Amino acid sequence: MRLCYLFLSFILFSIPVQAADYVAIQHAENQSLKLLSLSDSLDLALKANPDIAVAIREREAIEGVKVQAATRPNPFVSTSIQDTRSATRQIYFQLNQEIELGNKRSARIEAADAFYSKADAELATKQAEIHANVVLAFYELLVAQERVTLAKSSVEVAESALDAAAKRVKAGKSSPVEQTKSNVATATAKIELVQATTQLNNSRKRLSALWGDNAPSFEYAVGDVASIPEISSISALQTRIDNAPSVKLAKQEINARDAVTKIERSKATPNITLSAGVVNNQELGGLNQALLGLSIPIPVFDRNQGNVQEAVSRKFKAEDELIALKNKIQTNLLTQYERLSAARQASLSLQNDILPNAQSAFDAANRGFSLGKFNFLDVLDAQRTLYQAKSQYINALLEAHQSIAEIERALGEVVDHQITKP
């Protein structure tokens, strides 16, 4: 019996806490499994994400706006007849050309360039968002894989304990209550395995959906969830707020609104239309006479003042939005950095103190039970404590990776996921 519980102890303590170990074991069993790394996930998402494709199409559309902004007004031809009698008829032929004043064309070109830069910034912002989503989804998948592994091991331990309890009851060495408790523990472990498996399937789908694949083609994610990437100090991160993708986008929005304001102000200057043509005068024996003309609107009532006011207000609005955005990023950055620090500290405490103590308690419970000093409830309680400690450790690691992903969502790619910090 002592050997049986020592074997149970070995099973529980051999539960891996790193996704790399998990993948290595599975890969050794079947070399045909398809493995996915974080870099693979990022490459797939940045190349095939539908939202990024939308942003690229928008930038392509602005290229057409740039072409159109540089065009000049087309000339137009007009003709008219005065008097329908052939003897006194006068026929007018005119070529008219509108001349833009007030730097309208240069203002349009400047605005088109500004909106193209804005589209570029929107693309960069979307790429940063997708990058963060991939990092977040990938580490959630690694954690889901760890939870399945932990749940499977827990089921194995529970089933072995159930078998041992049944034998002790049959031999008259234990109360039937112990077998009932072991049955409950086994059923609970199986439920947790079903829940962990469901979470794993959902995590796989969430990750693959980021590159438009609703049916994941990979089998396992390769990575070390226990390695938390190294990140700069909070003061160093704060200096990068001005270069954050969303801040750059907000600045480009201000530039675009300023360019629109210039367009609206240029419209206050009316354009002129020059005309040149001939008049065929039948009264003078069909003589052709030169015809020159000039027309210009008189800006008495409409000076485009309403549109100018709107454009100026929208520019001020964009400036206020930039200030609000920076404040939001600053607050979020502080929150996520504190969250990261707490998660890192929790993971270290669990790894160095709580998990070893939980393991010692489980070993002691096993030894005591085999010597008749503890009852079976003590063994189950020690087993559950160890399982919860490992779950807390995995959750702390996930918290750390989630915080890093949110920091990258705010500031862009500021972390090298290959460089880790214990």
Predicted feature descriptions by range:
Residues 5-14:
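Bacterial N-terminal signal peptides
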Residues 5, 21, 126-243, 336-339, ...:
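Periplasmic alpha-helical coiled-coil/stalk elements that build and connect Gram-negative outer-membrane
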Residues 54-69, 126, 130-151, 160-162, ...:
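Amphipathic alpha-helical coiled-coil segments
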Residues 20-22, 43-101, 213, 238-320, ...:
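A small-residue-enriched
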Residues 110-113, 176-185, 376-383:
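Short, charged, amphipathic alpha-helical segments
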Residues 6, 20-25, 30, 392-422:
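Acidic, low-complexity, intrinsically disordered peripheral segments
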Residues 20-140, 148, 158, 173-179, ...:
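Short flexible linkers and secondary-structure junctions
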